[in-house]
Amino acid sequence: MSGLFITFEGGEGAGKSTQIALLASHLRNHGFDPVITREPGGSPGAEAIRHVILSGNAETYGPAMEALLFAAARADHVDQLIRPALAEGRIVLCDRFIDSGRAYQGVTGNLDATYMAAIERIAIDGAMPDLTLVLDICAERGLSRAGKRRGSDTADRFEKEDIAVHEARRQAFLEIARQEPARCKVIDADRSQEKIADEIRSVVDTILTEKGLL
């Protein structure tokens, strides 16, 4: 894979989609044609699974089986979209990837780390992100932002969960970043969109320069 694979992680209301859009605009200004995608979803098969997961219908199967659904969606996403785009030399910007699986299913789903690692390995089949940007914000602030963004729309099943669960996921993301500093960069997301975007652009531009692409 010769492109650049960048994932955005963080809790609800961290501003991932906004920052992805801003980074994509920056990249286009430099002549790149980035691919923007998300998880769960990103390919027709994965989007069908996304609907089942976010509707809450998969909860009855239990955390272990739900994790398999996420893995199935991820495998289809990687095979149908991410890997082909990287093979073309494209920059892929993905809203959530393996670290959300680790934090959502592995930590707050209380699933065994060995089990999670096994299905992750099968799902991505070597398609590891080059850079993961962890947008960090306290759970209370993030949920407040998510509520304002959502407006009158119904909250999805994850937004409805207890604040302690959201904070546990936040800490899980931070722990992943501590364990994998070469891949992960923690971004303070409790700032203005402009300041966050400036830092992200700086991080990405450095990588592109190192690769001789900028």
From Swiss-Prot:
Superkingdom per UniProt: Bacteria
UniProt entry tagged with the keyword Ribonucleoprotein: no
GO CC terms in record: cytosol
Annotated catalysed reactions: dTMP + ATP = dTDP + ADP
UniProt enzyme class: transferase
CDD domains xref list: TMPK
Ligand binding (ATP): 10-17
Function: Phosphorylation of dTMP to form dTDP in both de novo and salvage pathways of dTTP synthesis.
Protein name stated in the entry: Thymidylate kinase
